[in-house]
Structures are given as structure tokens and as C-alpha cells.
């Protein structure tokens, strides 16, 4: 009965012949195989242009021997430049979104530039308009008045340089909402300039004031006010956020990689941009190939048992005993995936150590084949190579070990042959050791060191229950989403610490020797 249940999953107690049961079992096995085969035919793998020419079975490096892939031939055709309907839709959407973002960004820059130009030219206009409109009626400008011209000139120069350094920097990101403090400062500058113009028009232009020194002092007061506004901008935009107030935890949703940061008072959208700046150099590169369990564990299916009693009623007790035996056997064979996972991990670590040792030895031997040419050495034109040629010459001896190691550690999508050659050329040019060359490949590095096509996301989505213009508060949680994973951010306020002082007299540190009969001094 146990043998029959291994094939069909069921145990029958009937008067059918053994040959009919075997025929039925053979037919059911054939059907199951045909269903699995037809189901497997629907799996299609599309390789994006520019990726390494490694098929989908290259990720199953554990099932291959060490010599697999040496004579493999890959045939590529026009599918290298193929594109799907989903790709076209995504590209169109990205273009529309980027067009909207560019328009909004340029509009903000235009408004800020126009306001800055207005505030910068207003003091100059205050001093020039009387000279143009009623020059003959103006009083003479004495020495003190002429000294104010120098003061205005240098203050305007300082204001121009400070505004350029603070406001006209290249933006690091496009925010979904208006930056509140920056908008408030722009409104403050606009109200200040308009107020000065109103007072100037009513008290100076209409009355044609003849005191030119007073007019110049009025322009100087506007420049001083603008300098104070610039100081306020430095405090609100730069200094306010320097004092740490919160501790934030950033967790990548797929693999659980996390980091902790201390941060000051910032809005949620600015915190999101600050997190993304730190994410690319603090978090290891996202590798989806490392997330799944081995296929040998995932593909294992437990057999189900059903026991039917088709005989007479007096065999009820016997049937019940048989069913209990079958259930007990199934319980003994209960899923032992944790054991298989343990041995799979141990075998994988052993294979990684072995191929790492081969790679280290291959790179060490390859670097011994070249040396920098000194000025006093005899020069043979046939033996002289530039760094690129030297990298290509020694790469062949380490290529096989490098390929197997990257395949075993599942890093092959992030290192193309061209990128490895460029890194090797860089190391040769700067006289770096083999260990310095291998540093990039022996472990997952920060995200930003890889090619942008592998990690750069054009757009992140900020998901928050709080308005993104609000400042951080204790317990605030928000997400930064992209297509394949998200960053979950939780906030905790730094606690308030209360310290007390206790004075200890240095003369109180006195000791005595506790001697016993067995003590040896």
C-alpha cells in the first residue's frame, strides 16, 4: 500500500487486479509529466540589452560543475534591440512625468530669479531716478553722501554672492510640494520690496524730494534689510537642521537591510531626499537573486494521503489502523526544509570559499606578469603597453575564475566584462595591489559604485499619511517606493537627558593592603 501511495497519492483497498493498477499509475504519471512539461513551456525569459550574456540557468550555478560554460555558444539576433508594449507605455509615462517636472522646476527658478533681480536693482533705481527726473533741483551730495555709494556697492556685492551661494545651487531633487521656508522668504522679500517702492513713490517721487543724501540713505536701509533677510534664510534653511533632534530607521522592504541616522528639524519631503542621498552610499546594492531560497527546497511538494475503505463493514477497525499508520508516516516525513536549507547554505559557503581562493590566486599571478616601466630601464617598443593594453593582456588569465566566482555569488548582473576591464585599468594605472582590485568583487559594495543602469531610479514615490510639508514628529512613518522595492522610514525623537554632578576629591583615593598569612608580596 505504501508503494502504491507513492505513485498515486492514494491508497485503495479493492478487488482490482495489480496489472490494472500499474497501468493506471503509469498513465497518471505520464499525464502529470505532460502537464508539467506544458506548464514549463510557458516560461519566457527576456534579456535586456547591455546585460551579460548569461542565460537564466546561470543562476543555478550550484547544479553545474566547475567546467560548465567553457564551450557554451550564445547566439543573439535582432532580439537584442526588441522592445515590448509595456516598455513603450512605461517610457511614454516617464517622458510625460519628466516634462511636467521640468516645467514646474523651471517655473520656480524663473520666479525666484525675477524676484532676486527686482530686489537687487531696486536700491540702484532709488538712487538713479532722482538724477534722471529732477537732477537740477537736487542738493549737492557731500562727502558723507559719496561714502554711502561705496557702502551700497559693497553691500550689494556681498548680497549677490551670498544669494548665489544659498539659492542658486543646482537642485538635488524635485519636491512634490512647495518648500515652505523658501516660499515664506520669497514672500517676505516681495513684501519688503513692494513696501519700499510704495513709500518711495509717495514720499519721494510725488514730492520730488531735494535731499539726495536722504534718498541714498533710504536705499542703504533697503540693502541692510535685504542682508538681514539673507541672514534669516541662512538660519532657517541651513543652521536649523544641523542640531540632531530625531533618530530615523530606514529598512529596505525586500531583504531587510537597515541603517540608523540622526537628523534635525526637516520637512518629510526634505528628509526623503536626504535619505536617498545616504541610501546610495550606505546600503549595499539591491540584488534580487539573493532573496529566494534554493529551488531544490521551494520545488519540494509534500504528498497528500487519502484512505478509502471499499471493503466490508467488519474491516472497519483494520482500515482505521491502516489510515493512522499512513498519517503517522506522513508526519515522520513532514517538511524538513530547514535541514535542507542548512546544508544548502553550508555547501554554498564552501563553494564560495573555494572559488574565492581560486580567484585570489589567479589575480595574484596575473599581477605578477606586469610591472611599471622605469626611466632607467631599457625600452623595447614591442614590450611597452599602455594601461588598457596591459589590462587586456592579464585579464584573460583571471577571466575564468572571475566568471565562476561572480556566478556563484550571484553578482554577474552587476559586473560586465567592460566594467571589470575599466576597473583593472584603473588599478594598474595607480599602482594598486591585487587586494585593492578584488575589493570591489569580494563583497557587495555600496549602490553608487555600480553602473547607473543597474540601480538608478528616475523617480521615487513618497507615501505618507502626514502632509509632506510638515516637519518630522515622533512616530512618523513614511515610505519611499520604486518599482522593485521600497524604503520604510520610522522616526523616533531623541530623548531628553538630565545629568547631575557629583564631585570626588582626588585626595580621597587612598587604599590599605589586606595581608594574610599566605599573602606573598
Swiss-Prot record:
Membrane topology annotation: Multi-pass membrane protein
Name of the molecule in the record: Vang-like protein 2-B
Biased composition (Basic residues): 19-33
The protein's role, per its UniProt record: Has a role in non-canonical Wnt/planar cell polarity (PCP) signaling; can recruit dvl/dsh and prickle from the cytoplasm to the plasma membrane. Acts in a PCP complex to regulate the polarized assembly of fibronectrin on the surface of the mesoderm during gastrulation. Regulates convergent extension in both dorsal mesoderm and neural tissue without affecting cell fate. Regulates neural fold closure during neurulation. May be required for cell surface localization of fzd3 and fzd6 in the inner ear.
Extracellular side of membrane: 130-147, 200-218
Record's compositionally biased regions (Basic and acidic residues): 57-67
Subunit organization: Interacts with dvl/dsh. Interacts with prickle3.
Biased composition (Low complexity): 1-18
Annotated organism of origin: Xenopus laevis
Pfam families linked: Strabismus (PF06638)
Major site of localization recorded for this protein: membrane
Entry similarity comment: Belongs to the Vang family.
TM stretches of this protein: 109-129, 148-168, 179-199, 219-239
Cellular component, GO, one term: plasma membrane
Keyword Iron attributed: no
Localisation: Cell membrane
Keyword line: Cell membrane, Developmental protein, Gastrulation, Membrane, Transmembrane, Transmembrane helix, Wnt signaling pathway
Chain segments carrying region Disordered: 1-73
Key word Plastid present: no
Tissues where this protein is expressed: During gastrulation, broadly expressed in the dorsal region in both mesodermal and neural tissues. From the neurula stages, expressed throughout the neural tube. In tailbud stages, expression declines in the anterior notochord but remains strong in the posterior notochord and in the neural tube. Also weakly expressed in the prenephritic region of late tailbud embryos.
Motif (PDZ-binding) on chain: 518-521
Stretches of the chain found on the membrane's Cytoplasmic side: 1-108, 169-178, 240-521
Listed GO biological process terms: convergent extension involved in gastrulation; establishment of planar polarity; negative regulation of canonical Wnt signaling pathway; nervous system development; Wnt signaling pathway, planar cell polarity pathway
Amino acid at each position: 500500500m505504501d508503494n502504491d501511495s507513492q505513485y498515486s497519492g492514494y491508497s485503495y483497498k479493492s478487488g482490482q487486479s495489480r496489472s490494472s493498477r500499474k497501468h493506471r499509475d503509469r498513465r497518471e504519471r505520464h499525464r502529470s509529466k505532460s502537464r508539467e512539461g506544458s506548464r514549463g513551456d510557458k516560461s519566457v525569459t527576456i534579456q535586456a540589452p547591455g546585460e551579460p550574456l548569461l542565460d537564466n540557468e546561470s543562476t543555478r550555478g550550484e547544479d553545474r560543475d566547475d567546467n560548465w560554460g567553457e564551450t557554451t555558444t550564445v547566439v543573439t539576433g535582432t532580439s537584442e534591440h526588441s522592445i515590448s508594449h509595456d516598455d513603450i507605455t512605461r517610457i511614454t509615462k516617464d517622458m510625460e512625468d519628466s516634462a511636467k517636472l521640468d516645467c514646474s522646476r523651471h517655473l520656480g527658478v524663473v520666479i525666484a530669479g525675477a524676484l532676486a533681480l527686482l530686489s537687487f536693482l531696486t536700491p540702484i533705481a532709488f538712487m538713479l531716478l532722482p538724477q534722471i527726473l529732477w537732477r537740477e533741483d537736487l542738493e549737492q551730495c557731500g562727502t558723507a553722501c559719496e561714502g554711502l555709494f561705496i557702502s551700497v556697492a559693497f553691500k550689494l556685492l556681498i548680497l549677490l554672492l551670498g544669494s548665489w551661494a544659498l539659492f542658486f545651487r543646482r537642485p538635488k531633487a524635485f519636491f512634490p510640494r512647495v518648500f515652505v521656508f523658501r516660499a515664506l522668504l520669497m514672500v517676505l522679500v516681495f513684501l519688503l520690496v513692494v513696501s519700499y517702492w510704495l513709500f518711495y513713490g509717495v514720499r519721494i517721487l510725488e514730492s520730488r524730494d531735494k535731499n539726495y543724501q536722504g534718498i541714498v540713505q533710504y536705499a542703504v536701509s533697503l540693502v541692510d534689510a535685504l542682508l538681514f533677510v539673507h541672514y534669516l534664510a541662512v538660519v532657517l534653511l541651513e543652521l536649523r537642521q544641523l542640531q540632531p533632534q530625531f533618530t530615523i530607521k530606514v529598512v529596505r522592504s525586500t531583504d531587510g537591510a537597515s541603517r540608523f541616522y540622526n537628523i534635525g528639524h526637516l520637512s518629510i519631503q526634505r528628509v526623503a531626499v536626504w535619505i536617498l542621498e545616504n541610501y546610495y552610499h550606505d546600503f549595499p546594492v539591491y540584488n534580487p537573486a539573493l532573496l529566494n531560497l534554493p529551488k531544490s527546497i521551494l520545488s519540494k511538494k509534500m504528498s497528500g494521503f487519502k484512505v478509502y475503505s471499499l471493503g466490508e463493514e467488519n474491516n472497519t477497525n483494520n482500515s482505521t489502523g491502516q489510515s493512522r499508520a499512513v498519517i503517522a508516516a506522513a508526519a515522520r516525513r513532514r517538511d524538513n526544509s530547514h535541514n535542507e536549507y542548512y546544508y544548502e547554505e553550508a555547501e554554498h559557503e564552501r563553494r564560495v570559499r573555494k572559488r574565492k581562493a581560486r580567484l585570489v590566486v589567479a589575480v595574484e599571478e596575473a599581477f605578477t606578469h606586469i610591472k611599471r616601466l622605469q626611466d632607467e630601464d631599457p625600452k623595447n617598443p614591442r614590450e611597452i603597453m599602455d594601461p588598457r593594453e596591459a589590462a587586456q593582456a592579464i585579464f584573460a588569465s583571471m577571466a575564468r575564475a572571475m566568471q565562476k566566482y561572480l556566478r556563484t555569488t550571484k553578482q554577474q548582473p552587476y559586473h560586465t566584462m567592460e566594467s571589470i576591464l575599466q576597473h583593472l585599468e584603473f588599478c594598474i594605472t595607480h599602482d594598486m595591489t591585487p587586494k585593492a582590485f578584488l575589493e570591489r568583487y569580494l563583497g557587495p559594495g555600496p549602490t553608487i559604485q555600480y553602473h547607473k543602469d543597474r540601480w538608478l531610479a528616475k523617480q521615487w514615490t513618497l507615501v505618507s499619511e502626514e502632509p509632506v510639508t510638515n516637519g518630522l514628529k515622533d512616530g512618523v512613518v513614511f515610505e519611499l517606493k520604486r518599482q522593485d522595492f521600497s524604503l520604510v522610514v520610522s522616526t523616533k525623537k531623541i530623548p531628553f537627558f538630565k545629568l547631575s554632578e557629583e564631585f570626588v576629591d582626588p585626595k580621597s583615593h587612598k587604599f590599605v593592603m589586606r595581608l594574610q598569612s599566605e599573602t606573598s608580596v
